[in-house]
Amino acid sequence: MSDPASWISERSQCFDSSGIRKVFDLAAKLENPVNLSIGQPDFDVPDSVKQACVEAIQQGKNAYSPSQGIGSLRSELQARVDKRFEHEDREVFVSSGTSGGLVLTVLSLVNPGDEVIIFDPYFVMYVPLVQLVGGVPVLVDTYPDFRIDLDKVESVITDKTKLILFNSPGNPTGIAASKEEVQGLAQLAADKNIALLSDEIYSQFVYDDQAYTPADYNPNTIVIDGFSKSHAMTGWRVGWVHGPSEVIQTMIKLQQYSFVCAPQPAQWAGLAALDVEMTQYQADYRRKRDLLVEGLKDDFEFTEPGGAFYLFPKVPSGTGTEFVTKAIEKDLLIIPGSIFSSQDTHVRISYAAPDATIEKGVEILKGLARG
């Protein structure tokens, strides 16, 4: 009798399934949860974007597109990137979501044994992705305020360091890096000849300052962006990546043998999305941020987030996992911080939810904090 379990590759056994998915599975079993666990907007895709997709389907634009993306979308993105950065060697292509862009970037750059610097806490995908390609994740602790200490970064750089993974505004912390942090990191990467990948999927959700990108200070920065968060298109799988042409051409080559292309109808929708004004949605999320912060500031210790749609407070006692267990007993869904970190002291709370849900969540959280 054959044993299918013996067929599983070692690389796929070095990490577990996403803990976030486990929480989502649990949510499906609760009748009416107060759900502050979701990492996607609670508004819908704009109507004009939906209509552009429908029209593309009806017009028969349903086949493969070029791997680098449909010409009109790629040209528009390239024009915007050129105007913004004025780099001679910055090229753009359309990826199958920002996650697809992350996969292709790491596949293009990281050899087995290469070290990749990741700031802790981190987006849940980063560490497993580096492990999947045989790289070595090197975590840089940013607790308690989740700011980048360049001395810490420099202290872990070795002759094996290949890549720095940077995310601002960050998931799970919501922290938007300052100009000084971004500029310093960009310069350090340039001085050390280390690739720098900037995950900017939340760049449209910055509330108190502006979104700073290391590409302004290091022309070899690779930038990942997309429509998933800004236009609530998480299920449409359209992102884009821009960076040095040699890297981008390698990623396009790998896309030909993996994702092939982003879904063509969704690319036409993405083209329409570029012309949709989204500032009201962003203002609404700033208000939701303030609602959550005001509700929890007397009972929890946290650094106020400047972007994205997450709060990452320290739990009053015990571990983050224990606190989440107690929250679930009250029908509240939040995410334990250990999913995003080597530490189990915090929880991630999403305010991408209706105001009434946020208010219910605040009351439950305050009750748990006060015992």
Give a label for each model feature.
Residues 1-10, 14-15, 26-30, 34, ...:
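PLP-dependent class I/II
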Residues 75-81:
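Short, well-ordered amphipathic alpha-helices
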